[in-house]
């Protein structure tokens, strides 16, 4: 599979234009698609589900897929950070802020801190100087810099922060909690193994779900409101899987099954279990 360089996807998007029924075509019992982008979207989507390898697709198609998936993950991470920010508003209890964060995360943050801020262990970890430490970090804008460095070390890019998150003194606690989320770990896998042939089945598994959600997020696929009102046995697999199956069935697309042996990818499954995406 041709390796595509990382495309920095912006998290700020304009609202999709409102379309009349004449501008849309039905592609599922609960889905419609914009006619302007219909052929390109359907061509790429069909290839994702019917090709035995992403490597058989054109470079331009892979670039679009890569950018779309990055956009979804980045928007998701920003949403999780915002959620943590609201949940922890006014909270300065270290025990609560640190409740879901492993010690290994802080060791990584400390290693990054040593790279661009001269300090010594007794000073940084002393309770006596904790307040002075925080003031120093704020003065040097170190929290945001550490956030950026950590993101770059894990993902090769970072999600731009809005002002209210940049000014939040608990941003590193928010980040520590978000790094334990399956979405963040899946993004790590996607970024690390994109373009590596031996991991293509892993990447394709992630792409199938992420690309489909990107089309909905982008406003190119419109979901009928009644899908959320009517119960269906297919909902058990999740609403996104249900809509994906709806699209494939309606369009007569037979997807190629992806077989992933956990023992063949121990490094991937040590990060997170991606089988729920299948």
UniProtKB/Swiss-Prot annotation:
Lineage: Viruses, Duplodnaviria, Heunggongvirae, Peploviricota, Herviviricetes
Family listed: Belongs to the herpesviridae UL79 family.
Pfam families: Herpes_UL79
Segments of skewed composition (Polar residues): 1-18
Domain of life (superkingdom): Viruses
Region (Disordered): 1-25
InterPro entries, per the entry: Herpes_UL79
UniProt name for this protein: Protein U52
């Amino acid at each position: 599979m041709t390796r595509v360089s990382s495309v920095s996807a912006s998290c700020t998007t304009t609202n999709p234009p409102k379309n009349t029924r004449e501008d849309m075509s039905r592609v599922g019992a609960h889905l419609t698609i914009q006619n302007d982008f219909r052929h390109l979207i359907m061509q790429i989507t069909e290839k994702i589900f019917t090709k035995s390898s992403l490597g058989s697709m054109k470079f331009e198609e892979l670039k679009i897929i890569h950018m779309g998936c990055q956009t979804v993950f980045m928007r998701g991470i920003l949403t999780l950070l915002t959620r943590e920010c609201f949940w922890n508003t006014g909270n300065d209890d270290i025990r609560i802020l640190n409740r879901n964060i492993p010690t290994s995360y802080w060791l990584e943050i400390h290693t990054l801190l040593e790279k661009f801020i001269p300090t010594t262990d007794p000073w940084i970890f002393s309770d006596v100087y904790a307040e002075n430490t925080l003031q120093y970090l704020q003065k040097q804008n170190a929290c945001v810099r550490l956030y950026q460095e950590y993101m770059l070390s894990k993902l090769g890019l970072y999600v731009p922060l809005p002002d209210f998150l940049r000014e939040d003194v608990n941003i590193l606690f928010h980040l520590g909690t978000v790094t334990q989320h399956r979405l963040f770990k899946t993004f790590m896998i996607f970024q690390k193994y994109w373009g590596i042939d031996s991991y293509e089945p892993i990447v394709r598994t992630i792409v199938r779900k992420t690309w489909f959600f990107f089309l909905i997020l982008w406003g190119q696929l419109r979901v009928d409101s009644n899908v959320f009102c009517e119960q269906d046995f297919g909902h058990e697999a999740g609403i996104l899987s249900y809509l994906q199956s709806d699209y494939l069935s309606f369009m007569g697309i037979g997807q190629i099954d992806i077989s992933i042996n956990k023992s063949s990818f121990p490094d991937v499954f040590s990060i997170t279990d991606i089988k729920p995406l299948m």
